[in-house]
Design a protein with these regions (language model features):
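Flexible "arm" and connector segments at domain edges
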Residues: 1-64, 70-198, 202-266
Length: 266
């Protein structure tokens, strides 16, 4: 193996290390990996980087961004071995994309506000992707996105051609309507429609969040944290009072829940 260790490494060193790991005399595990086998790794590393951002942990962010870069380098190396493209092609593609998407910086287009920039981007994306209708633009939203995020993007694209409520009240009314339809499906034991109606409720809730300029992913993220914190306090309180949560009546647990809710002011 022809590799010299040194004090500080750069991106080119990362690419070289990945090549060594994938070589016949490299690492058996790395050699066996395919795009699909490390797909979940890519997602996991990305979410860990996002968590570092959310917790404002810069040391962790530096580490997690490195893990994300490793995934990029691995996927590029897999294709480099097949002769389809390599990491330089990846860099070339994104550089060209950035230049095309910023004609107000690299060209003579006037876009001196964020609104103008975003409008230009939409026009450029539709042109470069040969999208002639807004339906094509909506279909271009990745199906692999988390569903709340995908819902938001679909709604945003539909709104750009006027297919939208006038204000949040219309979105709220639709949410209440969908909740009633879900309630009816449950009461009628209409198992076939329950999933569909629940999906409509979630989609409508995302629409309300969009009108309120609330990131639905972040809102649900915070709700999960709030529930976890409150549940932990309920469990602690139950233990202090000798209450077995597994056998205690729901009314007792609900009372503990309300007590914790009042003590924490939420």
């Amino acid at each position: 193996m022809n590799f010299t260790e040194k004090e500080n490494y750069n991106f080119n060193d990362l690419v070289e290390i990945v090549k060594i790991l994938r070589a016949p005399d490299g690492c058996p595990w790395d050699r066996e990996q395919t795009h699909k086998s490390i797909r979940s790794n890519f997602i996991e590393e990305t979410y860990e980087a996002v968590e570092a951002i959310d917790t404002d942990d810069l040391d962790l962010l530096k580490e997690e961004l490195g893990d994300v870069l490793l995934q990029v380098a691995l996927h590029a190396e897999i294709e480099s071995e097949q002769g389809t493209f390599d990491i330089n092609d990846v860099c070339d593609g994104i550089c060209k994309k950035l230049i095309i998407h910023h004609p107000h910086v690299f060209g003579d287009v006037n876009a001196d506000t964020t609104e103008k920039v975003l409008k230009n981007w939409d026009a450029i994306k539709m042109k470069t992707k040969s999208q002639k209708t807004q339906t094509q633009a909506i279909l271009s939203v990745s199906r692999a996105l988390p569903s709340l995020m995908r819902s938001t993007k679909i709604q945003q694209k539909a709104a750009k051609v006027g297919f939208d409520w006038e204000n949040v009240n219309g979105a709220l009314d639709k949410l209440f309507e969908e909740c009633e339809e879900l309630k009816a499906a449950v009461e009628n034991n209409d198992v076939e429609n329950q999933r569909e109606e629940l999906g409509d409720v979630l989609f409508s809730a995302v629409n309300v969040a969009r009108f309120l300029n609330i990131d639905s992913e972040h809102a649900l993220y915070d709700a999960c944290d709030k529930f976890t914190d409150r549940f932990s306090s309920v469990e602690k309180l139950a233990n202090e009072r000798g209450i077995d949560m597994k056998t205690a009546p729901l009314s007792v647990l609900d009372s503990l829940w309300d007590e914790v809710k009042l003590s924490k002011n939420y």
